[in-house]
Amino acid sequence: LVRFDASASLSLGGFSRDVGWALTLGDLMRSLRGLFAERPYNFSWVDEMVAASGRPVNRAQMLYIASLGIKAVISLTEDPIPEELVRGLGLECYHVPMRNHEMPDDESLERAVGLIASLTSSGKKVLVHCAGGQGRTGTVLAAYLILKDGMSADEAIEKVRSLRPGSIEPVQERGLREWAKRLEGRRRSG
């Protein structure tokens, strides 16, 4: 993992960070590539109501998302999508920040999954994204499949990875298994 330490404020694709922010090479590459792409990085459908991607970084990408009938965007990144990218597009934006390369806490994970379930049950198509659309996004999607379809953690992880190769980091994989056990325990006692 290559990191660059910013010595000044940096702005790429509508997102800015202050001095001292560590910029990974992956972040830089996604941002630069995203500036010229009309489709968000790593975009794909998970089912007929839920899509996933890396962070949308320009207005054209938000127009693309809206053109697909997506009505809600759930951002898992530390920063929400800037208002100027979505203004007037009829998109509902939700922000459930999660730290990159870590397993989210139960409250954040269940909030994101609850949003997906609530929005899709009301007929709204949803986009879930993090920076690259793999770690945090894959983790939330697997948790959604565990709750929605009653899959085991391993089945959900396998399903997400079959649809979105490279998804879910090892620490998140272990965390999903532990979370699924806690969820099952709450269901039994509850």
Regions found by a protein language model. Give the residues of each.
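Conserved G/P- and acidic residue-centered "switch" motifs that form tight phosphate/ATP-binding loops
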Residues: G133
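Ser/Thr-glycine-rich phosphate-binding loops at phosphate-binding pockets of nucleotides
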Residues: T137
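Short cysteine clusters
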Residues: C130
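Cys-dependent protein tyrosine phosphatase-like superfamily
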Residues: L1-L127, A142-G190
